[in-house]
Amino acid sequence: MSTPLLLLVFLGGAVATWLAGVELSKTTDALDRRLGFGEELGGLILLAVAGSLPEVAITVSAALGGNLDLAAGNLIGGIVTQTMVLVVCDLFARRPLTFLVGSLIPVLEGLLVIVVVSLVLLGGLLPASVAIGGVVSPSSIAIVLVWTAGIVVVDRVRRNAKWEVVMHGAQPGRPHHRMKVPNVPLPHEQKSTASIALRFGVACVVTLGAGVALELTGNGLADRAGVNGVVLGATFLALATALPEISSGIEAVRLGDNQLAVGDIFGGNAFQVCLFLPADLIAGTPVLPLAGRLNAWLASVGIVLTAIYTMGIVVRAERPARLGPDSILALVVFALGIAGLVRLS
């Protein structure tokens, strides 16, 4: 396949990912209302898992092809890129996004991200010989167990919080009462639950197919350009696979579901590192010990960015400019992180 055709297919996959992300946001919003999941759990499970389908496709395809550096780079680099989606969401919010969240549950979600990404770093320090059955890294299993426990904790706290938080001026959206946005109708309000679920499933299939196209064409373009697999996974592929989070995050903010916008990002980041377990099984060897210092650097940057926004929810600072202070700080850290990645590579 010629380079222009590869580029065209790559861009087509990116566009399909974006459009599917918009539909995922709308259908998840509608399913949350119909099924009563509540905002944070919906963002953590439904939209997070569906939004991670490109990463699922890329991880499976890369592991089958033995491109383990690309698989690891996309999973870890995606955390950095997707956290920066909160900067984009901040641009569309009337006040700083972390000011509007008005709940400590996203703080729990942020802490969950920090813990599972820390396990990624620990897994990278283990030798490949330390593996269950010679195939699976103990860290990969620990990540899945911690993520599952985190889901349970978030749900229990959401249903029966031991504390009451009063944040004046907050406009979280669901589950307490939807923030009213003039002239913005609720998505799929007149459709049946079965119809909404079908549209959700179709959007998931499109997202998954687009992820396969992105991996195949992205890998081909990288080979021709001589780009390192980690750098490719952490930059162009991570940006392309973050398109569902960008589209769904903007849509959530537009609908007034500010907690969902944050829950989408934190939930997706926490879930996608669970994909190291299937990557181990498919590759037949632990992937994390092969991640290298570039991925360790990216994971560290991801932890710092997550901590910035987690603290921002508690501090609730007003914006000095078009962006909140946490988003401004995140931009600085991101720029330094990319500069460091280029330097290390």
Task: Locate each region found by the language model.
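Hydrophobic alpha-helical segments, chiefly the membrane-spanning helices
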Residues: 1-345
